[in-house]
Structures are given as structure tokens and as C-alpha cells.
Design a protein with these regions (language model features):
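N-terminal small/polar loop signature for handling phosphorylated ligands or for N-terminal nucleophile
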Residues: 37, 41, 45-110, 157, ...
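Gly/Ser/Thr-enriched, mixed-charge loops and adjacent short helices
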Residues: 109-228
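Phosphate-binding and adjacent anionic-ligand microenvironments
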Residues: 270-459
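Short glycine-rich phosphate-binding loop at a beta-alpha junction
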Residues: 44-52, 169-171, 273-279, 316
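An N-terminal, well-structured beta->alpha segment
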Residues: 1-66, 70-71, 148-168
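Glycine-rich phosphate-binding loop
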Residues: 96-110, 225-247, 252, 296-298, ...
Length: 459
């Protein structure tokens, strides 16, 4: 038996599509069969399976598990929860890998799968290989068993293990995502006062879209912090692997700023350690890590790529602008928004001040948000290469780690191709608005030379 996946769902970091359109129940079954065959090739026998709270996650999970067991893999079902709980399961349980059914932070009609096998994320070429193997029908046969295991208590216990934070007044917004029930358990274990909103799981996301990196999605949290006069607020995305925050004045604390705060206590304990951030992060972050005695490392955007670089370098902490925060220090190295929140409370406690005070003391720069604009899929990487070649010929200071990051006397700008969508991504940062306008004009000038006009993408 063979199965053809819609090629658009085989993404760089996971499998994701629109349910009933590009992603079907048959795809979930075929993924289970193909993953079982790949896993058995590597000696895998037991796989943990979790799901988020989307309306179709249960249906996809059932088909996936049927495929796994018919392929000879035992499935250990941990039920509904955030993606990091599934990642935790791969360390806590006697299993050889894991699959989370999740649409991440995509709109409600999307869903997909995040895959782990033998201690690694399955991404890039390995995801393409799943499609190729499925189309050839190279499936294993067997009769695997299913088992249900409740690890929620163990997961929450591990989240607060060794916690040394002070009692703060904190607002929390779970965005009706899969982290909600775990959050309700977590705040009962933390000192202080906790005001939780939208912890009821609802896959239609009735209150706001669960993406805390978009400021409008933090409006309810800001209002809660202001109304209750809280110290700060914390928000999660739909599957609980990305974190957002606001201070006591309602100011958004972006991913690179969070990493700046979280790095200080880690470097106190591990002087000289490497701290990784993606190419979209502020230069002030890399400068601050160096000031604290750490080794800043700029790396490619993408949570699977960051995890791989952490393993390679032994870095205890990494983060992305998108709110993925990865702790290897006292944790497992995977991105977990709930754990990042716990460590944020600790970091503020250890600073001796308030999160608002920390924000007040941060270097003041002016930056664009992440600018995304649609381009022809076949041209997106070529455009970046053209820009790189022109700038290198002009003697500009260019970092080509991931796209083009150009350093100037008073700032920097970035242009890179998205690995997951037909868009180019740009960002710029300068000392003041006039400098920022000049850098954005440089981006537009380079795009124009490659025949592209910057029009904001709708996705």
C-alpha cells in the first residue's frame, strides 16, 4: 500500500496543513505506518503520543495510533497537553520517541505533527524522507499495543523542581490552548498571587489567536495586568512551546529581551557559557551576553536548528525572537513555555528588582517588528543570494549565517527566506527613528534591485 502526502504539508520543522484540505485522516494513518517503519529500522519499539486541544486533534491521533500499531510500534498515549509535555514524556517514560498532534500557533483549521525519534527532532531531509517512503509503501507490519499514561502530575512536579522564586502577582493567558489545564496545576505550586485567563481548552480560540508574539493577541493580558495592578503577565501559544510576556506597565517583552533576562542567572552559575540566539535577535542581546561574561552565538532561525546547535556546542540556554526558549541548564534542552515562565520568575527574583525595573534599564533602540512579505517560492532564496552578492561586492559588513544580516555604524538589518512559507522576512534596528528609516530604505533599495516590492504578507 502506498500513500502520497500533499507536498505542502511536509514542512521544514514539522508536518502541518489545513484539515480536510491538505491534511486528512488518511495522512495521519500513513504517517503512523511510515514512522513505525522508520522507527523500527532504528530499533524503536515504544512511542509516546500526545495531542493539543484542536477540534480535530482526537481524530488525527486515533488514525495516527492505528498506523503506528499496525506498523508494529507500541503507542503510549499521554492525552491532551502542551507539546513540551510530550517532549518531557520522551525523557520520563520508557519510550524511543514521540509524536505530538498539534497545529502549533496556526489558525484553528490547521493541524499537524511534531516528531521525535531516539533523542532528536525529526526535521528537514528526514521529513522529506517520510514522504518518499510513504509513496513507495515501504511499511513495516506488526501488532503494537496501546497504553494510556497520565504524566501531568509528574510534569508539573518537574517544572517546579528546585524553584527558588519570590512571590509575585502574575497574570497568565493560556489563549484557550493546550497549556491551560497544566497552567492551572502549575500556579497552585507557585508562591504569590496568580490571575489566570483563558485556561479552558477550546480549539476554536474564541478570545484571541494563541500567538503571543503578535502584540494584539496580548491585549487581554495587558488589560488584566493593568486592572489588577500585577507585577507582570505571561502568555502562551496554542501548544505551549512559545512564551510571551508584558511588564507591569503593559510593555511587551520580546523574545530577545526575555533571553537577555534569563541569561543573567545562568551565566552567574556557568561563567563563559555559550548562549545562542537566532539571527533576528537584537544586537543588544549579543552585547549583553558578552558583558555578562558569556559567549554569544548567532545561529539560524528554526527550533530544530537551534536544538541541534545546542547539542553541538553544549550551550545551556538558547532562544528565538519567536518566543521559543530552550533550557539545557536544569532542564532537557527542549523549548517549553511553561518552564521558561518558571525561570523568568526566578530570574526576576534573583535580580533583586522588578521586571518593570529590568525593562526600564534595558538599552533603548528602535526596531521594526518582523516584516514578512510574499515572494515567488522559487525565487525566495535566489533573491537573498543576489542581495548578499551585491553587498559583499560593495564591502558591506555581512553575516551570512541565515540570509543576510548587515551591520552598520548605528544598527543592523536582516533579510532571510522563510523555511516554511513563500515569504521573505526582514527586520532592522537602529539607535533612533531616523537611523531606522535609513536602514529600511536600504532593505527596500536592495529588494528593488532584485525586482521585489515589499508588501506585507497576509500569512
Amino acid at each position: 500500500m502506498t500513500h502520497q502526502f500533499n507536498p505542502t504539508i511536509l514542512r521544514e520543522y514539522d508536518i502541518r496543513g489545513i484539515v480536510g484540505d491538505t491534511l486528512t485522516e488518511a495522512d495521519a494513518y500513513a504517517l503512523g505506518r511510515t514512522y513505525a517503519a522508520l522507527g523500527r529500522d532504528e530499533g524503536a519499539r515504544r512511542i509516546a503520543v500526545g495531542r493539543d486541544g484542536r477540534t480535530h486533534s482526537g481524530m488525527l491521533e486515533s488514525a495516527l495510533v492505528r498506523g503506528l500499531t499496525e506498523g508494529g510500534i507500541d503507542a503510549v498515549l499521554i492525552g491532551m497537553g502542551p507539546s513540551p509535555m510530550l517532549y518531557f514524556a520522551t525523557h520520563y517514560l520508557d519510550v524511543d520517541g514521540g509524536i505530538q498532534v498539534t497545529g502549533s500557533h496556526n489558525p484553528a483549521d490547521y493541524n499537524g505533527f511534531k516528531l521525535l525519534l531516539n533523542g532528536r527532532s525529526v526535521f528537514g531531509a528526514e521529513i522529506q524522507a517520510i514522504g518518499q517512503r510513504s509513496s513507495r509503501g515501504h511499511w513495516s507490519e506488526g501488532n503494537g499495543a496501546t497504553e494510556e499514561v497520565d504524566i501531568r502530575e509528574a510534569y508539573v512536579n518537574r517544572l517546579v523542581e528546585g524553584f527558588s522564586g519570590k512571590p509575585y502577582r502574575v497574570g497568565w493567558d493560556a489563549g484557550n490552548g493546550a497549556a491551560g489545564p497544566i497552567l492551572d496545576m502549575l500556579v497552585d505550586r507557585l508562591p504569590g498571587q496568580h490571575h489566570v485567563i483563558f485556561s479552558e481548552v477550546d480549539g476554536t480560540f474564541p478570545n484571541h489567536h494563541p500567538d503571543p508574539t503578535v502584540e494584539k493577541n496580548l491585549a487581554d493580558l495587558k488589560e488584566l495586568v493593568e486592572r489588577e495592578q500585577l507585577d507582570f503577565g505571561i502568555a502562551f501559544d496554542g501548544d505551549g512551546d512559545r512564551v510571551g510576556a508584558v511588564d507591569g506597565k503593559g510593555r511587551v517583552i520580546w523574545g530577545d529581551q526575555l533571553l537577555m533576562i534569563l541569561a543573567a542567572p545562568v551565566l552567574d552559575e556557568l561563567p563563559g557559557a555559550t548562549i545562542i540566539a537566532d539571527v533576528k535577535a537584537s544586537q543588544t542581546l549579543f552585547d549583553r551576553i558578552a558583558e555578562l561574561g558569556g559567549r554569544p552565538l548567532m545561529w539560524k532561525t528554526g527550533h530544530s536548528l537551534i536544538k541541534s546547535k545546542m547539542k553541538e556546542t553544549g550551550a545551556p540556554l538558547a532562544g528565538e525572537m519567536s518566543g521559543h526558549i530552550f533550557f539545557k541548564h536544569r532542564w532537557y534542552g527542549f523549548d517549553d513555555a511553561l518552564y521558561a515562565a518558571v525561570r523568568l520568575i526566578e530570574a526576576v527574583s534573583q535580580s533583586g528588582g522588578s521586571l518593570t525595573g529590568i525593562m526600564d534599564s534595558m538599552p533603548k533602540t528602535t526596531a521594526t517588528p518582523e516584516m514578512r512579505f510574499e515572494v515567488d517560492e522559487v525565487r525566495k532564496f535566489a533573491i537573498v543570494e543576489e542581495v548578499r552578492d551585491r553587498l559583499s561586492g560593495d564591502g558591506a559588513k555581512v553575516d551570512a549565517t541565515d540570509g543576510v544580516r548587515v551591520s552598520t555604524g548605528d544598527g543592523w538589518w536582516l533579510l532571510r527566506a522563510s523555511n516554511t512559507q513563500d515569504v521573505l522576512v526582514a527586520r532592522a534596528e537602529a539607535a533612533d527613528q531616523s537611523g531606522l528609516d535609513r536602514l529600511v530604505a536600504q532593505i527596500d533599495d536592495q529588494l528593488a534591485k532584485s525586482g521585489v516590492k515589499r508588501v506585507e504578507a497576509t500569512h
